Amino acid sequence: MSVRIDIHADDFGESVHASRDILECLKDGKLNSISVLANMSCFEECVRLYREAQEEFPWQPAISVHVNLMEGSCLSDPKDLPDLVDEKGHFQISWEKLFFVSFLPSRNRFKKQLKKEIELQIKAVAGVFSELNLQELRIDSHQHTHMIPVVAEALFEVLEEQGWKASYIRDAKEPFFVFLQKTSLYKTYRPVNFVKNILLNYCSALLQKRFRNAGIKPMYLWGLIMSGHMDEERIRQLLPNMEKKAEHNGRMLEILFHPGQVLREEISDEFSQEDAIAFHVSPDRSVEKQAVYALDLAQKVRKR
């Protein structure tokens, strides 16, 4: 196989413990790239931990800005984001509301607020990671909100207005039928994740022209239908067909893991999306970390 594969971890900077987990993976050469979010209170400490550990990395990972509009504190003045945050500045908007707003007359009001925050979050990460070139930015987002039409429009306008360019923007386009080729796995999938897959594939279709015009290379993401439980056994079974699919369509393949676990005692009011807390503290994050180690794909794909 000649397809390019990226072994990626989201959520560096979500909590100190989660970030330490990710740093352990980096030091052991198990990841090719990570996403960094800048709007949690532990951000500066996590950056310090990264710098302390960096010399132990066998190679330097690619770093993406993990735009976070679902949780944490806004970097903007809360008064400038009345539709997105509460009185404490914590995000309180839902994914679903942003999606539906994309098709309503109020979209421009929301887009103006989104642009302020997206710009500040990109600047915050780029400001402490000199590895990030503002002419070759890598961008993704918490819960893939950048795929929502109004958020995507805000993001691309920020890039254009600031004179920034992106070499990578995650296209959360996950092949659907690959998961149906192994009938023995049917009962292992959560039905709600099929809904996520279909919805994000719809959003992806709306964004293909923007991606092409921005020079973003075509890709597949693997990590939606198995979201929350990217385990070794199923990945081994599905990987050959997933690689074939990516190679056939001339797309790179990003395999997305969440190997960093938030401790229950780290949960505070900045984790403002209550439904997501169980995901953050779930033991399944340890399952994903174990898979990253057992599969040991990061170094293999670097040699291709």
Residue ranges of each PLM-predicted region?
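Terminal accessory/targeting
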Residues: 1-6, 16-134, 150-304
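DG-centered beta-turn motif at the end of beta-strands
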Residues: 9-13
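N-terminal glycine-rich phosphate/adenylate-binding segment common to multiple enzyme folds
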Residues: 137-143
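An aromatic- and histidine-rich active-site surface loop
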Residues: 146-148
